[in-house]
Every structure is written in C-alpha cells, then in structure tokens.
Design a protein with these regions (language model features):
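Walker A (P-loop) phosphate-binding loop of P-loop NTPases
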Residues: 60
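Conserved lysine of the Walker
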Residues: 63
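ATP-dependent NMP and nucleoside kinases share a basic, alpha-helical "lid"
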Residues: 158-207
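Charged, amphipathic alpha-helical linker segments immediately N-terminal to NTP-binding catalytic cores
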Residues: 1-40
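Post-Walker A helix-loop "phosphate-sensing" segment adjacent to the P-loop in P-loop NTPases
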Residues: 72-82
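Hydrophobic anchor at the beta1->P-loop junction of P-loop NTPases
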Residues: 53-55
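Conserved nucleotide-sensing/catalytic segment adjacent to the nucleotide-binding pocket
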Residues: 82-84, 91-140, 155
C-alpha cells in the first residue's frame, strides 16, 4: 500500500498578516486544513480494504493526535477503528537499551517486543482480535494484565516512531497494511527565504509538551 505524503509548502507574508490580525482566525484556518487531510486519509484507508494502518512520523509531529483523529474520522464514515501505540509493546527497563546517561532509550527498536508485535498484528489481520500488553511507564515494567481488542470488522491504527520500519510492516501481508507518514508540511518564509522550518516548529511543540 502507498504511504500518504503531502509535499512541504512555504508560507509567505499573507498568512503572517492573518495571524497578526486574528490569531484565532489562523488557528481555525489551520484546524480546517488539518481536518480535510484527516478526512482524506480516512477515505483512502476505507478504500484500501486494509485492516491495519501503520502511522509514523518524527518526534512531536502529531502521531498520536493524528491517529486518534483518523480513528474518529473512520468511525464517522462508518468504519470501526481503534488506536494502538507501539509503546504498549515496550519490554521494560530491565530488557531494553539504555541512553548514555542510563535512561531508557524509547526510540530504539530493540525496546519493543518484536515477537509479540508480530503475534498481535497477525492475529488482528487474520481474526480481527488479539490481546495487547499493558505497559506501566511509572514503573517501566509490563503489567501482568492484558487488554483484549476486537476490531469488529474495522481498522487498527498502530502509531509510533517505528511503525513504518520494515521489521514491523513485513510482519503481515502487504495488502493488509496501509502506511501513513504524519509530519508538519508548512514552513515559514520572508521574501522567499525560509525563516522557520519544520524542525524548529517540532522543537517548540516538544518543549511545550514535555517541559
């Protein structure tokens, strides 16, 4: 399945003027544009017949938000949908790679329980049902409990930084997977010169989110 991809565009001074006159108007304009893209993605997913959507993007790109918005759009269009975070499959601090400072490296693929992901994805693609692990970030350990999931004939949206890694997308038949890359597409310029790029924006978003 093809990945949904939107080319970047440079935002010129006209949009700055909108922001200066009414920040609320700019926010609404941005929300409307985003909503149209989400609705478009939902239509493409429904048309693909895939049971599993693999959604990824860089840090602070809006992966989790987009996954839940996509699920809502799918439900509105008549397709049941549920969201699964790849963080659910973390093995735990005792079994995962560490950063140089000793903290858990959540962005390392080896942090995830790949055999269990394979099992769950295959069960979802074949039966629409599986049992998901529950990860406790406070204790950095996997809970003994599990979470049953039933797609009810719908779609599972798997979101995470490794969602498009071939190690994961190759676990189930290609016709059962739809791939989506979520990322910021607007960069801001003055006189054709880029002054705020998507990396700057993501850094600001992550700072606001995690500070």
């Amino acid at each position: 399945m093809i990945t949904i991809w939107v080319p970047k565009r440079l935002v010129e001074i006209d949009l700055y003027n909108v922001a200066a006159r009414s920040p609320q108007a700019l926010a609404q304009l941005s929300e409307n544009s985003y909503a149209r893209r989400v609705q478009y993605a939902a239509q493409k997913v429904r048309g693909s017949g895939a049971k599993i959507v693999m959604l990824t993007g860089p840090s602070a790109s809006g992966k989790t938000t987009s996954a839940h918005c996509l699920a809502k759009a799918l439900v509105q269009q008549g397709t049941p949908a549920q969201v699964v975070s790849l963080y659910t499959f973390c093995k735990g601090a005792a079994y995962s790679p560490k950063m140089p400072d000793g903290t858990l490296d959540y962005e390392n693929l080896e942090t995830l329980d790949l055999p269990l992901i394979k099992q769950c994805l295959r069960q979802l693609s074949e039966t629409g049902k599986t049992e998901l692990p529950i990860y406790d970030f406070a204790t950095e350990q996997r809970s003994a409990a599990v979470e049953p999931i039933d797609l009810q004939g719908g779609v599972c949206i798997v979101e995470g930084i490794h969602a498009l890694n071939p190690e994961l997308t190759g676990l189930v038949p290609d016709d059962q997977i739809y791939r989506i890359y979520a990322g910021l597409r607007e960069e801001y310029c003055i006189d054709g010169r880029r002054v705020i790029n998507t990396q700057d924006i993501r850094l600001c978003r992550r700072t606001l989110r995690d500070a």
